Amino acid sequence: MSLRGVSARLLSRRSGLRFPRFPRTWSSAAAHTEKTQIRPAKSSRPVFDWKDPLILEEQLTADEKLIRDTFRNYCQERLMSRILLANRNEVFHRDIVYEMGELGVLGPTIKGYGCAGVSSVAYGLLTRELERVDSGYRSMMSVQSSLVMHPIYTYGSEEQRQKYLPGLAKGELLGCFGLTEPNHGSDPGGMETRARHNPSNQSYTLSGTKTWITNSPVADLFIVWARCEDNCIRGFILEKGMRGLSAPRIEGKFSLRASATGMIIMDSVEVPEENVLPNVSSLAGPFGCLNTARYGITWGVLGAAEFCLHTARQYALDRIQFGVPLARNQLVQKKLADMLTEITLGLHACLQLGRLKDQDKATPEMVSMLKRNNCGKALDIARQARDILGGNGISDEYHVIRHAMNLEAVNTYEGTHDIHALILGRAITGIQAFTVGK
């Protein structure tokens, strides 16, 4: 499906969802800054627009803008109204997956199988808008699109693609990705999950435990990576209800509370041979999935950072201390300038990386560089915004503290800040530093 085709689909689907209009509150005003600010008057001289400092808008295609704007409306009108209580009560709304499937934004870069087939930049713009609301919602979308649909599309058989991708694209099926284990986070090569082949009945028996798995408590499908008897790493498609398979929820999170996180416990789960992903047999499989997901994260975290910047700016303009707005304070202006600079540079780097991906010129090191940079900078921006809000900054009604808490997790998962530094260090020096003496 062409970009223009998916744009039309997004718009036509939107009317069917009948988005309600919610009264504007101060806490959501910053998210709508772009709608409420007066555009500079046209003149013969260029005028600096702080909302788009290096004119990113002109580098996007008409279809990319339309896709983004349509999804932005959905996120602000349907999701922003739910997130406060969802985060406060640690509730994941399954209906959101159906709604996103209706909009066509799940697995959006995949061509065929009910997917939209949009550009990598369009996908990045979608994650940016979603994480502007909440990192937990974006995490769900990233897992579904990059860690479940991508491996089935890239490493799966045609039968597997036909069987699973249409349902995943519609949101009828929700998936999760099992790689991290209790004793193996940054070192997936040490995984203890085992798959034993049973030639007599053409199946595999999986045993092991995965943890910190987004979507697992509510998942219908489980993409699980296990070490086989030949020492190869293979991917398996497990289905909810298989004997010996359970996915208990992890309770008490202070981050990503609007998404469901849990474990995958496999007690001699029998999986038919037809559920093995046939086109990969090494860690290149899960790493390829993670690189795809990390790309979406590089855009997404900047959406959260933008929300924090806009909220802090509006608060500094409205808040009067010592008879003047906080925004008159030089230290506050410096913080806002630093935030704007980092967001702008990050967005343009994301755009370049997206164009390179669509030309098959992107490398894992490029993704690591931006995942590391943008996550770290977004977390710093959220912390600075919370500081500008003073005591109000710790109230969830202003949303900034929620973004800060979420970004603590995002800066850690799918490769920590330091692990990505080692990936880059290896590329720079030619020497791996993940292990000592090897």
Swiss-Prot record:
Binding site for substrate: 138-139, 186, 287-294, 415
Catalytic activity: glutaryl-CoA + oxidized [electron-transfer flavoprotein] + 2 H(+) = (2E)-butenoyl-CoA + reduced [electron-transfer flavoprotein] + CO2
Mutant phenotype after disruption: Animals show highly increased protein glutarylation in liver.
Example GO molecular function: fatty-acyl-CoA binding
GO BP, sorted A to Z: fatty acid beta-oxidation using acyl-CoA dehydrogenase; fatty-acyl-CoA biosynthetic process; L-tryptophan metabolic process
Gene3D superfamilies documented for this protein: Acyl-CoA dehydrogenase/oxidase, N-terminal domain, Butyryl-CoA Dehydrogenase, subunit A, domain 2, Butyryl-CoA Dehydrogenase, subunit A, domain 3
Sites where the protein binds FAD: 177-186, 212-214, 319, 330, 387-391, 416-418, 434
GO cellular component: mitochondrial inner membrane; mitochondrial matrix; mitochondrion
N6-succinyllysine PTM sites in chain numbering: 51
Transit peptide: 1-44
One Pfam assignment: Acyl-CoA_dh_M
Pathway: Amino-acid metabolism; lysine degradation; Amino-acid metabolism; tryptophan metabolism
Active site: 414
Cofactor: FAD
Residues carrying N6-acetyllysine: 51, 65, 240
Subunit relationships: Homotetramer.
Family the UniProt entry places it in: Belongs to the acyl-CoA dehydrogenase family.
Function: Catalyzes the oxidative decarboxylation of glutaryl-CoA to crotonyl-CoA and CO(2) in the degradative pathway of L-lysine, L-hydroxylysine, and L-tryptophan metabolism. It uses electron transfer flavoprotein as its electron acceptor.
Protein name per its UniProtKB record: Glutaryl-CoA dehydrogenase, mitochondrial
Record organism: Mus musculus
Gene: Gcdh
